[in-house]
Curated annotation (Swiss-Prot):
It holds the Pfam family Flagellin_N. The lineage of its organism: Bacteria, Pseudomonadati, Spirochaetota, Spirochaetia, Spirochaetales. InterPro entries: Flagellin (IPR001492), Flagellin_C (IPR046358), Flagellin_C_sub2 (IPR042187), Flagellin_N (IPR001029). The flagellum consists of an outer layer composed of repeating units of FlaA around a core that contains several antigenically related polypeptides. Interacts with FliW; a synthetic peptide of FlaB1 (residues 229-247) partially blocks binding of this protein to FliW. GO terms for cellular component: periplasmic flagellum. Belongs to the bacterial flagellin family. It is found in: Periplasmic flagellum; Periplasm. Keywords: Bacterial flagellum, Periplasm. The gene is flaB2. Component of the core of the flagella. This is Flagellin FlaB2. It comes from Treponema pallidum (strain Nichols).
Length: 286
């Protein structure tokens, strides 16, 4: 029997230290709900998890971006509806003025209303704003006559670079629709049946222009609706994948924690027994 080195006690102490460390890790995981709390727990798993988290947060923001885009489109469409109603009324008055039974004085009264309605078209265009940005004055329109863009509304609908799309909204002022002269800014004149007749054709083109823009906005909105649904599914699936990597299985971890607690208790008891074994040497010295 030797007394300088108690191998049983040394083994028990080393094993007990390892088990205590395991218990500490069990407690960390159970309290945080995470299998990976630091890089030392799983270096590669942490790297993959953080990359996934970046994508998940990007997708969640992209979904919000797309929903904001839908709101932008809905606001623009609402203003265009008002413009349509005004143009329809001007056309109705033009059809009325084109009838020969009205006198010059009658047409003058009609012209007064037409002038006010044309001014309303410009008011709508100048007041149609989203987050302080004018929507119907050409800010987001294609440049006339060329296949280039003066500006556009970009919607970033992905988690990564260049995953975006843009929408165009044409100029919807009275000048752009031909019901106000671009030079002297005079209003469409319907003081004779001939002028009123020509005005009907101009107004038909204006209505066609608005209808085309509203159809484009409807297509943009439908696309963004599908985009939001797709992004949400992608984010959900990626979140599930990230959870499998990073989150702890609580039931399994609790079983492991219970096992390690028992080992700590038994290890402590055995360390005491190992230390006590050397005390028997004293009986030889008596």
């Amino acid at each position: 029997m030797i007394i300088n080195h108690n191998m049983s006690a040394m083994f028990s102490q080393r094993t007990l230290g390892h088990t205590n460390l395991s218990v500490q890790k069990n407690i960390e995981k159970l309290s945080s709900g995470l299998r990976i709390n630091r890089s030392g727990d799983d270096a590669s798993g942490l790297a993959v998890s953080e990359k996934m988290r970046s994508q998940i947060r990007g997708l969640n923001q992209a979904s919000t971006n797309a929903q904001n885009g839908i709101s932008f489109i809905q606001v623009a469409e609402a203003f265009l509806q008002e413009t349509t109603d005004v143009i329809q009324r001007i056309r109705e008055l033009s059809v009325q003025a084109a009838n020969g039974i009205y006198s010059a004085e009658d047409r003058l009264y009609i012209q007064v209303e037409v002038s006010q309605l044309v001014a309303e078209v410009d008011r709508i265009a100048s007041h149609a704003q989203f987050n302080g940005m004018n929507m119907l004055t050409g800010r987001f329109a294609r440049q006339g006559g060329e296949n280039t863009v003066t500006a556009s509304m970009w919607f970033h609908i992905g988690a990564n670079m260049d995953q975006r799309t843009r929408a165009y909204i044409g100029t919807m002022t009275a000048v752009a629709m031909g019901i106000r002269d671009a030079g002297d800014e005079s209003v469409m004149n319907i003081d004779s049946p001939e002028k009123a007749n020509r005005a009907i054709g101009t107004l038909d083109q204006a209505i066609k222009r608005i209808n085309k823009q509203r159809a484009d906005l409807g297509a943009y909105q439908n696309r963004l609706d599908h985009t939001v649904a797709g992004i949400n599914v992608a984010a959900e699936n990626l979140q599930a994948a990230e959870s499998r990597i990073r989150d702890v299985d609580m039931a399994k971890e609790m079983v492991d924690y219970t096992k390690n607690q028992i080992l700590v208790q038994s290890g402590t008891a055995m360390l005491a027994q190992a230390n006590q074994a050397t005390q028997s040497v004293l009986s030889l010295l008596r």
